[in-house]
């Protein structure tokens, strides 16, 4: 099937356009693989993971996730404000969080909660930072420490995490 898909990192769902409607791809259990702009996506539980690297030794997958934080409300004359009492959470009422975009004002900020999955010998282990990587690879801790210090590895950059794992695995 050739469709225009989009992965929603807030809801962790695969979406596509059907006319003017945005539809969610469901059930995902019947899907093997999707390709988005050259990125290989595979179903895992109720969400999709991006396959960044695969080899006989290990695979590195990315769990793209964003947390939506309310940044403010539209006040007088369309200006964003945080003043006043907040009685209603629009999300709890099912109101589309994209409504603010139509007015050119984004009422939300998004916090990155992306994590990685390391697959070795059919076992999947999740990590977000160097401390959680130490826990799943305790025997490689000295090598990881040395590499991270020397290369100043940033865990929010998937390619840097991949290079670290290639060196230490």
Spans of model-derived segments:
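Long, compositionally biased interface segments
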Residues: 124-169
